Amino acid sequence: MTALRICFVGDSLTAGTGDDRFLGWPGRLCQEERKRGHDLTCYNLGIRADTSTLIAPRWRAECTARLPDIYQGAIVFAFGNNDTAVQVGSDQVRVPLEESLATARAMLSGAKAWKPTLFIGPWPCEESKQPVNPSGLLGYDFRNTRIGEYNDAYAKLAGELGVPYLDLYGALGADPRWLQPSRAGDGIHPPAEGYSLVAEKVAGWAAWRRWLD
């Protein structure tokens, strides 16, 4: 049995937007690990529409408040989709690739020096439903070509830093079970079934298992 407090730091895909059970993949992941006998505390620090540059100013303070050094703590970053998005009416991505990489480097380096750290990359969008307009006010256009480009760059960066990286873009894109929930969602946020599949991918990831088993 492993006792561990974990901060899941990210955006709406971390928060679980679109999941009618409001668990997202972190809640489902930790729920299943509890069934295996592990004593996990799950802190979901996902904020809708956050990019890497919006996460960067907040992650350390939010994690510090939840991970006192007297307890075993760890951090899982999960971001990138919003960096690749183009806001409707603009012709620029929200965070250019080089800026996104520099921001990710600073966060991952700082986190790794403090706590065990994992990085989970962006996942594929459903292009037939673009742009995504959940609020009715702002629309964001996601494209898999851009997501794939950022994903490859994040994977390379994580390798350089020695931070384990989960390529969800590849893992979900290659899994036929992703097709239905991807199409059933709004174009980027799947319903519950999609988050369950993401939780399954994380649960089977060797880097995650090393924390627990």
Go through each PLM region and give its residues.
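Serine-esterase "nucleophile elbow" of acetyl-processing enzymes
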Residues: 1-48, 52-54, 58-70, 75
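Alpha-helical cap/lid subdomain in secreted, periplasmic
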Residues: 38, 57-213
